[in-house]
């Protein structure tokens, strides 16, 4: 069955076929970052599975890498953009999954009611840089005491390729330099071939030793 976004009150699904809409899995290989994702989702006792996803509408533009055709999250990206109709409302636990079946169970009476005249309340949570600055000042970043994840940890998600841009640029520069050196080598070989041809022609055209003519008497 098609998957849907695990964020509360978000109806985006794989089957929507919307352009510029991508889905991203939870960073299970980085527990601290995973805790931030789950906390920002706003669902009580929510436990994502390996195939649970969240759509790209819940990330700020700076969370994505500008290189490539597909939207790739940066290694420290955190979902912070949510539109909750009631910020104090927390949905009950729907099980350990974030797929479409759990999504149907997560629908509450409040979600089925029409929005208020004022419209949904746009809630933007503090981004990761602000939380890191708070930690540097000696203050707790969140009630759970989140810490900054250690750099260099392996990850199986798209945002783990934080150095993808740098690696591709280095590859392009290397290929360009290789092409230049090949042209230079080709020119050197051509020059060497011409020089050898001239030397061979010179040797073939050089006259051999001749006998001395006898001296004529007076």
Curated annotation (Swiss-Prot):
Residues covered by region (Disordered): 97-120, 133-154
Chain positions of all zinc fingers (THAP-type): 1-82
SMART domains, per the entry: DM3, THAP
Membrane-crossing segments per the record: none
Phosphoserine PTM sites in chain numbering: 100
GO biological-process terms attached to the record: positive regulation of transcription by RNA polymerase II
Superkingdom of the source species: Eukaryota
Residue ranges annotated as motif HCFC1-binding motif (HBM): 156-159
GO molecular function term, any single one: zinc ion binding
Coiled-coil residues: none
InterPro entries for this protein: THAP3, THAP_Znf
Annotated S-S bridges: none
Keywords of the record: DNA-binding, Metal-binding, Phosphoprotein, Zinc, Zinc-finger
Tissues and organs where the protein is expressed, per its UniProt entry: Highest levels in heart, liver and kidney. Lower levels in brain and lung.
Subunit structure as annotated in this protein's UniProt entry: Component of a THAP1/THAP3-HCFC1-OGT complex that contains at least, either THAP1 or THAP3, HCFC1 and OGT. Interacts directly with OGT and HCFC1 (via its HBM).
Chain's role: Component of a THAP1/THAP3-HCFC1-OGT complex that is required for the regulation of the transcriptional activity of RRM1.
Stated name of the protein: THAP domain-containing protein 3
Source organism of the structure: Mus musculus (Mouse)
């Amino acid at each position: 069955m098609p998957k849907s976004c695990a964020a509360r009150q978000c109806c985006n699904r794989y089957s929507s076929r919307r352009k510029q809409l991508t889905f991203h899995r939870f960073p299970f290989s980085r527990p601290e970052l995973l805790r931030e994702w789950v906390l920002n989702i706003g669902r009580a006792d929510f436990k994502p599975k390996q195939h649970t996803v969240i759509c790209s509408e819940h990330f700020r533009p700076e969370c994505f890498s500008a290189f490539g055709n597909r939207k790739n999250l940066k290694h420290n990206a955190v979902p912070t953009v949510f539109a909750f109709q009631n910020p104090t409302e927390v949905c009950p636990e729907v099980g350990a999954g974030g797929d479409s079946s759990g999504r149907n169970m997560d629908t509450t009476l409040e979600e089925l009611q029409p929005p208020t005249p004022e419209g949904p309340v746009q809630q933007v949570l503090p981004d990761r840089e602000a939380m890191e600055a708070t930690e540097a000042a000696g203050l707790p970043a969140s009630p759970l005491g989140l810490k900054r994840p250690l750099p260099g940890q392996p990850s199986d998600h798209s945002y783990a390729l934080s150095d993808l841009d740098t690696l591709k640029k280095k590859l392009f520069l290397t290929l360009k330099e290789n092409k230049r050196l090949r042209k230079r080598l080709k020119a050197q070989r051509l020059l060497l071939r011409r020089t050898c041809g001239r030397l061979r022609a010179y040797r073939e055209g050089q006259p051999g030793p001749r006998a001395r003519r006898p001296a004529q008497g007076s």
